[in-house]
Amino acid sequence: MAKFPKKYSTVAEVEVVVMDAIPGEYDGKPTLATRFGVLSAKNVKTGAEEILADVVGTVQDFTIFSNDEGKLPAMVEDFVKGARITLNFQYNAENGRTRYRKPWVNPLQTDISILTPEERNILGL
């Protein structure tokens, strides 16, 4: 099982435009080398403004590596030349490193029509 750093935290969401994406290989496993322009940042946490000021308006290179089983994550499908996507910008305070992650999207739907008026009141809906 892969070991992941435990100290990364999301400090902002960045809007990017994919400028290039090239499949490759590292250690016999597939990779995707990407280059994207960081257009803007939103939901910037207090204290991260300076880091984001250095990133917004720049071109970034980011390589997506496969997992231990040799499979690339599903997020590679979004990295198509010309695509505009949102990524979580994460920072590790222990070593000063940054990384990008695709925001998790909750696929669940909230159908309040199944709730009684009392249940809606309890849930604040």
Predicted segments — roles?
Residues 90-121:
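OB-fold/S1-family single-stranded nucleic acid-binding modules
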Residues 38, 79-80, 89, 105:
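Extended low-polarity, hydrophobic cluster-rich segments
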Residues 66-87:
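Short nucleic-acid-contacting surface segments enriched for D/E, G, S/T with interspersed K/R
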Residues 59-65:
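A short, exposed loop/beta-hairpin motif centered on an aromatic-Gly-Thr core
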Residues 2-6, 118-125:
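Short acidic DE-rich linear segments
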Residues 1-56:
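OB-fold ssDNA-binding interfaces and closely related basic DNA-contact patches used
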Residues 17-19, 37-39, 65, 88-90, ...:
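A structural detector for beta-sheet-dominated domains
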